[in-house]
Amino acid sequence: VAIVNVGAVAVPLNSWGKAQELQQGLEDSEASLVFADEARLSFIRELNASLPAASADSGNTNHTTALADILKRDTAVAAEVVAVDRHDPAILMFTSGTSGRPKGAMLSHFNCCQALMNVEFIGAGTYMTNMEEMNQQLASPIPPKTLLAVPLFHISGLLSQALINLRHGRALFMMYKWDIDEAIRIIRDEKVTVLMGAPVMLLELLKNEQFGD
């Protein structure tokens, strides 16, 4: 959100990818700044030693700034208001590459907003077809909480779950990767009410003996 807010283009890369895939994404997008953890940053430094970076778990070096140091700074800088057109690029997502090299798909500001509206429209349709059950859920004292169990570099994780929950101020719990025991623990302890994922994930959850408890 902060990246887009200053008029830049966000490029979520496959953090599980190998060095070659990261290199392709950085080169194709002509990235000028990278946010990464130490594991990914070690790959990136082998490819581009001088690319400016900010890291959550690395110290300061010639071209890397620790995020902790940025957050500790006493001086607050007001974000510059940048005029953007609705058709200006906002996010560059990469395909999975199952049929060849991953390909970049540019999403404009309008595309992103329309995608969020589509999710809300589907939600409204779901409510209208299941009003009695949905009203029971809405009457629950437990507020809506979502478990994010898919990657943010995938469109369903970023737009359909992360940004839609941010838009409505709902709690979002993020998993590093899918693990059935960890998912059940989070659902139980945090009283999660929403989980969206691949069919195999949902089936694994429903078949687990702990889920009924």
Regions found by a protein language model. Give the residues of each.
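Conserved AMP-binding/adenylation subdomain of ANL enzymes
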Residues: 113-145, 153-194, 208
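Conserved AMP-binding A3 loop
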Residues: 90-129
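Structural core segment of the AMP-binding/adenylate-forming
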Residues: 5-72, 79-80, 210
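Conserved AMP-binding
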Residues: 14, 149-154
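Conserved pre-ATP/AMP-binding loop-to-beta segment of ANL
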Residues: 75-94, 100-101, 131, 136-145
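Short hydrophobic alpha-helices that are characteristic scaffold elements of the AMP-binding
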Residues: 1-6, 27-28, 154, 166-167
